Amino acid sequence: MDDAPGASDEAREPLLKRVGASVEGTSLMNHRLMKNPKFRALLVESLMALTTFSFMAKQTEGLAGPELSTLNDCGEAGCGFTKFYQFKGVVGVYAGFWAYTVILIAMYVIRKAPPPGTEFASYALFTAAMATFVVMSITECASVVLSSDYYVCKNADYSLVSLIFAAATIVLNCLTCAFAWRQWGELKFVGLPKTLSALTETYPG
């Protein structure tokens, strides 16, 4: 009976060591993950995308239409973002990209990150869509209404802030694309269609 406590302590020691090793391993993995520049960029991109579509979605009034009929439809308060397909496109694309970044962050955390080629392709497609709608939105924002000192986004602060974050996200995405391309190149562009392989040999990047 007297040996039972000692035997119990001896039995616990291996378990405590395993738990300690597991906690230490998890801490080390998280430390390495946070030192990964691509992962840190991903966190920032996720936050910026969330800010972009949230601010644009908050623009429920204040926008002016370039046509008198639009002004009459919206009244003195002005139009919401839903009256403009360009702004709706920004909300849709950036909301989709934010969802993608959340999934990607989870995959990094569980150490199931996609290959660089997949990341590059997805980032390139999202960035192209972002750039298209942001350019159209900026053009629409700057459109003159009635007089030269009155433009579509003059009283639309949320939209202006949204487009600033949208442009910054595109810049960061381009840097991530370049980083993913370099990683893919180190893997000899595995998975790239043969028709494009000649381009990578000529222009390795």
Swiss-Prot record:
Kindly state which keywords UniProt assigns to this record, in alphabetical order: Cell membrane, Membrane, Transmembrane, Transmembrane helix
Asked whether the keyword Cell membrane is assigned, the reply is yes
So where does this one cross the membrane?
Answer: 39-57, 90-110, 125-145, 160-180
- Among the entry's GO cellular component annotations, what is one? plasma membrane
Q: Which domain of life is it from?
A: Eukaryota
The stretches that face the Cytoplasmic side, renumbered to this chain, are 1-38, 111-124, 181-205
Bilayer topology reads:
Multi-pass membrane protein
Can the keyword Metal-binding be found in this entry's annotation? no
- Compartments in which it is found: Cell membrane
Segments in the Extracellular topological domain: 58-89, 146-159
* Protein family according to the UniProt entry: Belongs to the Casparian strip membrane proteins (CASP) family.
> What is its quaternary makeup?
Homodimer and heterodimers.
Query: What is the protein name stated in its UniProt record?
Result: CASP-like protein 0U1
Q: Which organism is it from?
A: Ostreococcus lucimarinus (strain CCE9901)
